[in-house]
Amino acid sequence: YEEVERLKHKHVDKVHLVGNPVRPEVLVLRDEDYPAFTEDGLLKVLVTGGSQGARVLSEVVPDGLAMLPPALRQRLQVTQQCRVEDLERVRERYRAHDIPAELGTYFEDMEVRLADCHLFIGRAGASTIAELTAVGRPAILIPLPIATDDHQAANTREMVKAGGARMIRQPAVTIKEVTGWDDKDNRTRVAQADAFQKLAKDISLQIQAMAMAPQTLANAAHAAWNCGRPHAARDLADLVESFGGIDLMDVIRVGGDNHQRTTETAQAAGLANQDRAA
């Protein structure tokens, strides 16, 4: 990202911004158009919470979508990743709201689903941000509140400032695990229920702000795309190469002119070490 925190001033001139490399199967989607979203067409929403899913999204996203105006709610097509223990409960919630949703604990073809969606809802890890901006997908981001140094919130800044995403804070009370039934625990449960309700409402309001007019969502997609750094892997490799001389690069580059000689030298050194050990 452009902004680097806790960096000593004397090191500012040494900073090289390359971005976060993304998978090739995601990167190829960068040149594809944002899927058409019309006044009466489907609104395809992709919801994920990282590799293990995020329980809070299972709690609040179905209810938030149900709060949308009927004209928009009836056009929803949802794909959501859930934890295995939440799957049936979330399915029942979508069924009760009469919202079509495909649920799963893991999607192997996530790049296909990312390409097909109009709007992403999820956490704000660095890899997620990199993929969203590489492809150009607008997002509602809910940073993990217990992330070290609040780094997920920091991850959202560039995308939010550009207009490619909206960020919603998850109240800390929602992550507390309550197992008892004393007065304090019951008060916490009430506070959690209120916080979940507010979070669902915030999601609904942000979706309306982005999706009630098709052009607004398309503009957000373009803004997200402009934040992408598609050449991160190449730029990082070039930067690493710039630190070394020719001999070092021959070791690093598989297939370099001296690769065979380097390999033979390493093998010979290994045999010599074996002889000494014997």
What role is predicted for each listed range?
Residues V4-V15, R89-A96, R113, L132:
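Short loop/helix-cap segments at secondary-structure boundaries that form the rim of catalytic
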Residues G104, R123, L141-I142:
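A short structural motif in glycosyltransferase catalytic domains
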Residues D31-F120, A153-R157, K161, I168-D182, ...:
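Donor-nucleotide binding loops and adjacent catalytic segments primarily
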Residues A115-A130, R137-P138:
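Acidic donor-binding loop of glycosyltransferase active sites
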Residues Q192-A193, A209-A278:
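C-terminal amphipathic helix plus adjacent low-complexity
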Residues E2-K8, R89, T128-I129, D149-T156:
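Short, glycine/polar-rich helix-capping loops at beta-to-alpha or helix-loop-helix junctions
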Residues Y1-L29:
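Active-site-proximal region of nucleotide-activated glycan assembly enzymes
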Residues E25, A162, R166-P230, S242:
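Leloir-type glycosyltransferase catalytic cores
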